[in-house]
Amino acid sequence: MSKRKLNVALIGYQFMGKAHSNAYRQVARFFDDLEVEPVLKVICGRNEENVRKAAQKYGWEEYDTSWERVVERKDIDLVDVSVPGNMHAPIAIAAANAGKMVLCEKPLANTLAEARQMYEAVQKNKVPNALCHNYRFAPAVQLAKQLIDEGRIGKIYHFRG
């Protein structure tokens, strides 16, 4: 059975961009019954030399340095927002207003007001949207939570996640 192609634009190429690139390439190995096949269309970042290298290294067809240009592309179905949190709202809102599906890395927004604007944009435009919490259900994270809840590692004074 032929799978529907899902043309992906990834905004951000550094740590989370690398993780998301890998996930798109590996998803079919983990889920046999996917109805769609992600197509790595374009990766976007501010530094042209670095984003060009990322496109080659991670298997993207193209690269761009303007997220504004990318979200307006007619051939893009999904915009994956994997940049620092201060840029999530403007990119996600523009993508929703352009009729694109929106996948946003955590944190959703820097403020409640930004989060509400993002919510309103995806609702108004009736676009599918999701927030990534990649490691919430990872076995190591679940075990750490269990050990903390059971008090088995003592009092927590500092946590970085």
Please provide the spans of the model-predicted regions:
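N-terminal Rossmann-like dinucleotide-binding module
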Residues: 1-58
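Structural signature of beta-strand start/N-cap positions in the alpha/beta core
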Residues: 7, 39, 75-78, 100-101, ...
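Conserved G/P- and acidic residue-centered "switch" motifs that form tight phosphate/ATP-binding loops
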Residues: 12, 106, 151
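Alpha-helical structural signal in soluble globular domains
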Residues: 23, 27-30, 57, 93-94, ...
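Short loop/turn motifs at secondary-structure junctions
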Residues: 37-39, 59, 75, 152-155
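Receiver (REC) domain switch-region micro-motif
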Residues: 43, 79, 159
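Beta-loop-alpha module in the N-terminal Rossmann-like domain of NAD(P)-dependent dehydrogenases
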Residues: 47-49, 58-121
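A contiguous active-site-proximal alpha/beta segment in oxidoreductase catalytic domains
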Residues: 109-161
